[in-house]
């Protein structure tokens, strides 16, 4: 090889055979291209444990008592490289667990502590997560010891639980079962800002703080929920109360839970701002290899202990910050407060007057005492009328406060895990909670063939059977494991009245299916899924393919009493590319919306492609529209959608916004109409490659088989009991 070709002057003396870091990407060249990467995250290729590893099975061998004993010991085993405040790591571990679980938001179910995502960017480097890299390193010896039996996701949350227990709180319980991911999540929208802690104005439609952009549940980029100094760093407890009410509600918390969590989180530990925050080093993701993933190097003093800088606020909230008590409310409600600046220059509230013995002691020297402090969010609990009433009640009744907090903490740390059937371990509470979306156990002792025969003999069409089953199952979100066909909530409020479920058509179909369920002993939930299966089997037969759609009985029927109507509002579909429907025009393109829904359902690009092609020819479009029904054999499960989409005898002409006519190139005759959701499978190079596979003459049966496999995946997405 000519050395002159491999060593151009001033450039890297290596031939660039791979794009590992600095080369231009497709996104750089075509920033508006459809990003299918979000459908192919967390592939087995990135998982070092291998595709045959079962965390559920590994957990069965975990010595939980020994683990908890080790965590209790860790809390007071202060390490010189990162010493514990007052000799107790409780406050740090609670903040780590809180900031892991607290990223959850109800709008799309994303975020939360269910995947151990705090280990990766951007969360590992958020300004609100300063020093949590140290918390995880303190846990590493325990993770190393228990290995594959214990995920990081479970350990991070459990460490917070044990921290509270070690300081005197009786917790409500704990469930294992969170599985780790192995690279950053690509599907979560954290905001459009390009600057940490940028002014919040870009997230709001007006000065009204309730207009926070959906699906966000934090007021600024890089914060977990609200700014502790006040709105955009300007102290005003009443305005901050507005932010709290919005952000906590988007984490599924009511006013009482909000007060409990805020006060309970600040009953222990302290804030850190005894230094110059501008001197902190780079966040973990941007550090040199020699730092080994530890960030925010602090050159002030020892850079740790009393010199630690995190939020910039400085001080403890209570007199005894390593014990669970009612000290927070005692301090907040019995003192007058004034604004001060911390040593780091952050706004905080300090008492106008306080007895010396009521001040918390220094983290290193108990002979030194400092003023306690309150954040603007803490002061909101005192000045907001509703929060104040709740705070007064908690102050008067420590036992009640402890109970409400323990339940709210359990909800915060488990909300993203889905139904109780996913909970593992010896400390799972027996009580069923409404926010867990309970579903009674279903029956398996009925005759499935009899149910299918009754459905086949009914007056319901293939499109009605398939569309109803699809609508029942499509609500599933792999983000927080909510929704799905189990429970048959499609027959209850609010789902029965959702516009996207075509209430009139749905009611007509449900009457028939509910009667069949009652006559055969099957649950309505199972009957709805079987209805879809029967429709598909009929359609496949019409296409010349005999196939039995796999089915697992056992879905239960839930009730109105077991359904929190308000909490299900966030699951209402406002679009469904699979049924070629948009409730209205949105700023985001229809194909991007379909991609988002596909990711939430846990489907791949190939599965999305085959499902759309199949559902189109089955005539399941919303309202019976004919857009994208590229077939003369509607109701037969053929590959006609793909064959005709890729046929160059046709041309595609727009005739209205986002609508197209498919015309014969020679005659100009309009053959079909289409939406962007149809044509994207021919225009996007990746999706077209899948469409071409299914359009091939030798893949007609493969198309049916792949459609059925993807269909069953959707129908069983919420059958966590099958994993057992």
From Swiss-Prot:
One of its GO terms (cellular component) is cytosol. Heme b binds at residue 266. The record marks 95 as: Transition state stabilizer. It comes from the Bacteria. GO terms for molecular function: catalase activity; heme binding; metal ion binding. There is a cross-link at residues 225-251 (Tryptophyl-tyrosyl-methioninium (Tyr-Met) (with W-98)). Residues 1-20 are annotated as: Disordered. Formation of the three residue Trp-Tyr-Met cross-link is important for the catalase, but not the peroxidase activity of the enzyme. One of its GO terms (biological process) is hydrogen peroxide catabolic process. Keywords: Heme, Hydrogen peroxide, Iron, Metal-binding, Oxidoreductase, Peroxidase. There is a cross-link at residues 98-225 (Tryptophyl-tyrosyl-methioninium (Trp-Tyr) (with M-251)). It catalyses: H2O2 + AH2 = A + 2 H2O; 2 H2O2 = O2 + 2 H2O. CDD domains: catalase_peroxidase_1, catalase_peroxidase_2. Binds 1 heme b (iron(II)-protoporphyrin IX) group per dimer. The active site is at 99 (proton acceptor). Gene3D superfamilies: 1.10.520.10, Peroxidase, domain 2. Its EC number is 1.11.1.21. SUPFAM superfamilies: Heme-dependent peroxidases. Its cofactor is heme b. Belongs to the peroxidase family. Peroxidase/catalase subfamily. Bifunctional enzyme with both catalase and broad-spectrum peroxidase activity. Homodimer or homotetramer. NCBIfam families: cat_per_HPI (TIGR00198), PRK15061.1 (NF011635). This is Catalase-peroxidase. It comes from Pectobacterium carotovorum subsp. carotovorum (strain PC1). The lineage of its organism: Bacteria, Pseudomonadati, Pseudomonadota, Gammaproteobacteria, Enterobacterales.
């Amino acid at each position: 090889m000519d050395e002159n070709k491999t060593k151009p002057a001033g450039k890297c003396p290596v031939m660039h055979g791979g794009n590992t870091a600095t080369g231009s990407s497709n996104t750089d060249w075509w920033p508006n291209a459809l990003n299918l990467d979000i459908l192919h995250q967390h592939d087995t290729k990135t998982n070092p444990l291998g595709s045959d590893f079962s965390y559920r099975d590994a957990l069965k061998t975990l010595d939980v008592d020994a683990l908890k004993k080790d965590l209790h010991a860790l809390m007071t085993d202060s390490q010189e490289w990162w010493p514990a405040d007052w000799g107790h790591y409780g406050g740090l571990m609670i903040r780590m667990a809180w900031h892991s679980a607290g990223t959850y938001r109800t709008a799309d179910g994303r975020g939360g502590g269910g995947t151990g995502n705090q280990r990766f960017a951007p969360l590992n480097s958020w300004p609100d997560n300063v020093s949590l890299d140290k918390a995880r390193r303190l846990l590493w010896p325990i993770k190393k010891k228990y290995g594959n039996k214990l995920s990081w996701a479970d350990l991070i949350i459990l460490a917070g639980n044990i921290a509270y227990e070690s300081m005197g709180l009786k917790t409500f319980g704990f469930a294992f079962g969170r599985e780790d991911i192995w690279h950053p999540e690509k599907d979560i929208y954290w905001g459009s800002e390009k600057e940490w802690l940028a002014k919040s104005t870009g997230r709001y439609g007006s000065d009204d703080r309730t207009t926070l952009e959906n699906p966000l549940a934090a007021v600024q980029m890089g914060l977990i929920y609200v700014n502790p100094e006040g709105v955009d760093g300007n102290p005003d407890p009443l305005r901050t109360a507005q932010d709290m009410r919005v952000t906590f509600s988007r984490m599924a918390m009511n006013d009482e839970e909000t007060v409990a969590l805020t006060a309970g989180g600040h009953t222990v530990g302290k804030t850190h701002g005894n230094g110059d925050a501008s001197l902190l080093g780079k966040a973990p993701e941007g550090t040199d290899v020699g730092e080994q993933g530890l960030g925010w190097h602090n050159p002030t003093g020892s850079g740790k202990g009393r010199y630690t800088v995190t939020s910039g606020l400085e001080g403890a909230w209570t007199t005894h910050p390593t014990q669970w008590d009612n000290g927070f409310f005692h301090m907040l409600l019995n003192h007058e407060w004034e604004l001060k600046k911390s040593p780091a220059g952050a706004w905080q509230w300090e008492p106008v007057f306080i007895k010396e013995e009521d001040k918390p002691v220094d983290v290193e020297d108990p002979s030194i005492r400092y003023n306690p402090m309150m954040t603007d969010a803490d002061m909101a609990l005192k000045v907001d009328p509703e929060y104040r009433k709740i705070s007064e009640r908690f102050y008067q009744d420590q036992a009640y406060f402890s109970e409400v907090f323990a339940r709210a903490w359990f909800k915060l740390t488990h909300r993203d895990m889905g139904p109780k059937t996913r909970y593992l371990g010896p400390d799972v509470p027996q009580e069923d909670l409404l926010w867990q979306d309970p579903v009674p156990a279903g029956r398996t002792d009925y005759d499935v063939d009899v149910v299918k025969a009754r459905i086949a003999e009914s007056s319901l069409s293939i499109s009605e059977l398939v569309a109803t089953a699809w609508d029942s199952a499509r609500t599933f979100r792999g983000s927080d494991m909510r929704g799905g066909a189990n429970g048959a909530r499609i027959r209850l409020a609010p789902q029965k009245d959702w516009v996207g479920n075509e209430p009139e058509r749905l009611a007509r179909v449900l009457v028939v299916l509910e009667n069949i369920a009652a006559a055969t002993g099957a649950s309505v939930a199972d009957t709805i899924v079987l209805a879809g299966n029967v429709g598909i089997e009929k359609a496949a037969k019409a296409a010349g393919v005999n196939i039995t759609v796999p089915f697992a009985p056992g879905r239960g029927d839930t009730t109105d009493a077991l359904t929190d109507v308000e909490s299900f509002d966030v699951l209402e579909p406002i679009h469904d590319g699979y049924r070629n429907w948009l409730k209205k025009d949105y700023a985001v393109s229809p194909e991007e919306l379909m991609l988002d829904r596909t990711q939430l359902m846990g489907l791949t690009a190939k599965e999305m492609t085959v499902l759309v092609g199949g559902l189109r020819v089955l005539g399941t479009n919303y309202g019976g529209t004919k857009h994208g029904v590229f077939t003369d054999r509607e109701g037969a499960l053929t590959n006609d959608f793909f064959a005709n989409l890729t046929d160059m005898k046709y041309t595609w002409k727009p005739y209205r916004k986002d609508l197209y006519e498919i015309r014969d190139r020679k005659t100009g005759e309009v053959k079909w109409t289409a939406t962007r959701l149809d044509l994207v499978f021919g225009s996007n190079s990746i999706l077209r490659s899948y469409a071409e596979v299914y359009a091939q003459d030798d893949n007609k049966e493969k198309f049916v088989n792949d459609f059925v496999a993807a269909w069953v995946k959707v129908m069983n997405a919420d059958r966590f009991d099958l994993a057992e």
